[in-house]
Amino acid sequence: MASVDEGGRRRPRLAASLQISPGPWKPSGGQEPTEAGDAAPRTAEHGVAGAQEAHREACKALGGSVLSPGPAGDFPGALHGLSMLPKDPPPAQAVALLTQCMANLGVSLTFLEDQTAGPGSSFSVCADLDGLVCPAGTGSSKLEAKQQAALSALQYIQKQLERPEPLVTPRQPLLTSLSIETILTHEQRCAAVVSAGLDRLLSESSPYQACKGTVAAVILEREVQGSIGHSKETYELVALGTGSSSCAGWLEFSGRRLHDCHGLVIARRALLRFFFRQLLLVTQGGPKGQERSVLTPQPGPGPPFALKPGVFLHLYVSNTPKGAAHDIYLPLASEDSVLHSPAFRLQAHVCGQLKPVSYVAPALRDTHVGCLSASDKLARWAILGLGGGLLAHFLPPLYATSLVLADPCHDPSTLNRVIHSRPRLDSVLGSCLPCPYVRTTLHLFAGPLVAPSDPGPSTCHSLSLNWSLGDPDIEVVDVATGRVKTDSSVGPPSRLCKAAFLSAFRQVARALEKPQLLSLQTYEAAKAVPYREARQQLSLLLDQQGLGAWPSKPLVGKFRH
């Protein structure tokens, strides 16, 4: 069974007793066995006969027996067959090839139709490889979407085979059927779904390949019951962002410009877009939408919805968050002395430079874009959650369970203190934060990179990409303008801008028939009162403890449309 922390949030099974995990996780010897029958692939349209037919189709299409059928769990033989697969098989044979691959590996396969994009949109299907949800394939028909999903899964498998170390020691007795959980650790699974998602969204010839080096993402984990009652987890990429800079110009007050285009910030904004979509799915999608949504109605006086039990959020970040976490020489000392270290104070990106907020002149702060560092925002999200003020009307605080940092040069101890020690919350008198806001612990992991972190000179330094589950493609934002990149001088607003979120907020309010929310005139006024109070109290604590005042920009949120 998975453990539960004090806040009721289940810790990742692979990190049940860890708060910092700089080394590789190794599976425990007490893993529950899997029924032999569970080794056969489970698909929506393929049984045993279907797998045999799929193999015949694949062999016929590729002119020979590329994947010879063998007993489920014949891992060495399956590896040899997989290494002979064509790099880019025809879409028409992808489903057959994937089915036979999984049969030989003893890994269950299920094709899941995804309707989060809503009625009238293209079909979307994803492949579930024994708990690992691969990026969705889309198409004008279910068959086309399924073929694209199979291609994506095959690309992931081939990528794993190209790793220098084997996925599993061939001499290891395979007493149980292989599953993704026994092949990959938590941090590897997070990196795998991010890597597969990037490969799906960016072709090898894409001019934005270099943007992968700054990727950050949010992975949604669902705990599901296996065939004999044991639990397993599925991992799915739901939000993604890239970028390494912010807009350096004047403040914009219409809500149509993205000021901060750092990868982690963009991924979090893409997550907000995902949850607004989920709210529409659960309210307007009927019984099927309620079943597919990750949200469930919540009785009582609080927010009307909450995450379903067994659903968790994980962050993946390629680079050490800018700001305090970058100072790997931060001395180990008492909490009070560390808090007063200059490197520990709030820092902001202003006019292309990262500097302590106390060094920013008020005239500059009130007129120019100033964005707090990613280190500071992680500390804020550990208390206020990822959801922000608009979603707070509909959902309780959305806290991430873990953070996988792929930068090999980061210092785990510094990162932990940067996130969890600022500001200091009084354990005797209480934090004075309004309910339900509390500081939560992010379980930290060192994970693998999905792309070179420093690809060299590139035009991508001035661009930011974003995507969330349900979007047909990535959106490319010009950091200098904070708008979508186009050939014209000024592009359209991004789908992640404040004005877009205010529109989504009103759409959900109408769906829930809440006229009191529709009467809120401006973006700032639309933020839930408990959230605003918690944000104000957090800013006060930071200032009182000498860490700097959280920059307030009330005029930025005064727009109405």
Swiss-Prot record:
Q: Describe tissue expression.
A: Testis-specific (at protein level).
What residue spans carry the region label Disordered?
Answer: 1-53
Q: Which residues form the DRBM domain?
A: 90-159
- Give the disruption phenotype, in one or two sentences: Male mice are sterile and show defects in germ-cell development.
Organism in which the protein naturally occurs:
Mus musculus
**Cross-referenced PANTHER family, in alphabetical order?**
ADENOSINE DEAMINASE DOMAIN-CONTAINING PROTEIN 2, EUKARYOTE SPECIFIC DSRNA BINDING PROTEIN
**Mind listing the GO biological process terms from this record?**
RNA processing; spermatid development
Q: Which domain of life is it from?
A: Eukaryota
Which protein are we looking at? Adenosine deaminase domain-containing protein 2
